[in-house]
């Protein structure tokens, strides 16, 4: 066999191989999903992230031809469920719904050299599903209408012993609470709780003075006047609470932070599957029924691209790194 025939034979073999790979990829895209999809929620049932996940999962089930079931895997501030997700096969049949605490937990654990995963390398962004504003709350017994009045109250009354609650060490409210203490030079003690529900109960009872969480966790109580809203961390005032100032308006720009719920897949999930998931998430959150329910929760339907989600995640991780290092929380 001369050189020409050997080269021709090699070219034919390569061509057949590439065709087979192309057909395999096309078949994979056409058969996905081939079984039920599990959506991990790394928090207990009943919270904002869980509610949003169930709304999205229901609509995805209707359009994808396979059940999308929510699997609550709570613990360690969301890290247990996220770690399970990082180890799942990258085939699109296991996805994750997480929130603002995802980049925070990753940064805090990395700085402490105990992170089981890397948000930037172990996960693939699918979409920011919704924006959910973070709101600073207080017991109605607190004689301050916003965060600056609270700071003045504490500075001028050294005998006051106020506490602020969070959903646990290293949580969003814990970090923001310490940032608030440093920015305003006030003394206020951190009390960690095991979730948003017990924190809210202590606020309602007046045994806890200050708290903070996603708006949907306390919107009903704020509207009823049983919990007071001191500020939101959003970049602009939110329609549900038009009289509540933003932290930036109050001269506390370092506390500005967009709250969100988003969908992730394992790293190395094929691009065509990411694109399909993105399309399905956008369709779900923009369905009129879902948008109405989200609005009732104080959330805003988004449905971003994967690249927009990646950019936001990087921005918030940089922000959290700066806050944690500045306050030596690591």
What are these regions (language model features)?
Residues 2-16:
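Bacterial N-terminal signal peptides that target proteins for export
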Residues 22-24:
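N-terminal signal peptide c-region/cleavage motif recognized by signal peptidases
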Residues 29-122, 182-214, 221, 303, ...:
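N-terminal (or domain-start) structured segment
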Residues 34-36, 182-186, 223, 249, ...:
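An extracytoplasmic/periplasmic, membrane-proximal ligand-sensing/linker region
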Residues 38, 58-61, 65, 83-86, ...:
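Solvent-exposed, non-membrane alpha-helical residues enriched in polar/charged side chains
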Residues 46, 100-101, 139-144, 166-171, ...:
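Short coil/turn segments
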Residues 118-128, 187-191, 209-210, 219-257, ...:
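Short beta-strand->loop
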